[in-house]
């Protein structure tokens, strides 16, 4: 989980949930995260489908050089994005909820959480330095 700070807004946080996986349960999990955020009264964008990637490979059936009998396999990785915009404390509580109490999350679905904190503009114009 990475946190980057941007100078705009007033003490708000935008959290992006990047989901990717090979399972057909991925859209269900993305909808469930968005639904839980909307029930909590959090401004939500998504779930947005992102471009999927596919990998294909061919394997010989026999251990010898028989080119007539081969198996072909394909693996598709689907991706979804859900974003929430909320005050810092609410966003932190929702991220903790998603990480701990949102079952069932499949073992084939990976969730990456990216947070962006918007600082008050008064901090930008004061003598404080933001690193």
From Swiss-Prot:
Keyword entries, A-Z: Mitochondrion, Ribonucleoprotein, Ribosomal protein
GO cellular component: mitochondrion; small ribosomal subunit
The keyword DNA-binding belongs to this UniProt entry's keyword annotation: no
Pfam family, one: Ribosomal_S10
Location (main, coarse): mitochondrion
Location of this chain's protein in the cell: Mitochondrion
GO molecular function, one term: structural constituent of ribosome
Domain of life per record: Eukaryota
Record Gene3D superfamilies: Ribosomal protein S10 domain
Any GO BP annotation: translation
Presence of the UniProt keyword Ribonucleoprotein in the record: yes
Family: Belongs to the universal ribosomal protein uS10 family.
Protein name (database record): Small ribosomal subunit protein uS10m
The species this protein was found in: Dictyostelium discoideum
């Amino acid at each position: 989980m990475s946190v980057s700070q941007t100078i705009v807004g007033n003490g708000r946080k935008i959290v992006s949930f990047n989901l990717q996986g090979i399972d057909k349960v991925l859209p269900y999990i993305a909808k469930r995260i968005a639904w839980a955020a909307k029930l909590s009264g959090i401004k939500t964008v998504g779930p947005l489908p992102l471009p999927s990637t596919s990998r294909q490979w061919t394997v010989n059936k026999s251990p010898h050089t028989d080119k007539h009998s081969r198996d072909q396999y394909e693996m598709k990785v689907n991706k979804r994005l859900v974003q929430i915009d909320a005050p810092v404390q609410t966003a932190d509580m929702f991220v903790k909820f998603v990480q701990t109490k949102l079952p069932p999350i499949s073992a084939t679905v990976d969730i990456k959480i990216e947070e962006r904190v918007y600082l008050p503009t008064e901090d930008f114009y004061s003598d404080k330095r933001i690193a």
